[in-house]
């Protein structure tokens, strides 16, 4: 137990400034609980959205593409910005612990996560860094017009078989986000793939509907 206490105290001392509770709510529920609701895709490509992102210092435009934006998910001012709900899409790394006793008192540490969105006439393309996760660790689904992304992985990093008893050190990472789909998104055609620690999500767009104008005779 002495080793357990030492492991816990070191982790809490190093990460207390970033500590944050781990929530078990679903991505959609977390987004719904937010007063601003889920992220709206349209805000990513509006001038107002760009100004808001620049104000917070959390967004840097991607190079070479006028319809793409790269966002560093770091909330510095607590003000609303285009990727407001991606503050919830942050990996939560549980403090390394020994056995279930430590897992019950472990706090969470956050680390920055970057995301990028690109848009063309046929699709939206989203890219998120999810280091340590494979395709079996990520779930992507659409719930009532909200694109939900949830990922979690837990690894045993060290086993302790000393005189204090059996136990193990472990680490976990959790990712989640809720994104409100635009009206032209085709939910049935959404695809997702994890490659080299990066989640790629493609959202096809429906063809632009032609506007119908009918003249009304005024009498």
Swiss-Prot record:
Keyword check for Mitochondrion: yes
Cellular localization per UniProt: Mitochondrion
CDD domains, sorted: ACD_sHsps-like (cd06464)
Chief site of localization: mitochondrion
PROSITE patterns linked to this entry: SHSP
One family name in Pfam for this protein: HSP20
GO BP term (any one): response to heat
Chain ranges of the sHSP domain: 104-219
Induction conditions: By heat shock.
Keyword set, alphabetical order: Mitochondrion, Stress response, Transit peptide
Transit peptide: 1-29
GO cellular component terms, A-Z: mitochondrion
Keyword Nucleotide-binding: no
InterPro entries reported for this sequence: A-crystallin/Hsp20_dom, HSP20-like_chaperone, HSP21-like
Record text on subunit structure and interactions: May form oligomeric structures.
Stated family: Belongs to the small heat shock protein (HSP20) family.
The name this protein goes by in its record: 23.6 kDa heat shock protein, mitochondrial
Taxonomic lineage from the root: Eukaryota, Viridiplantae, Streptophyta, Embryophyta, Tracheophyta
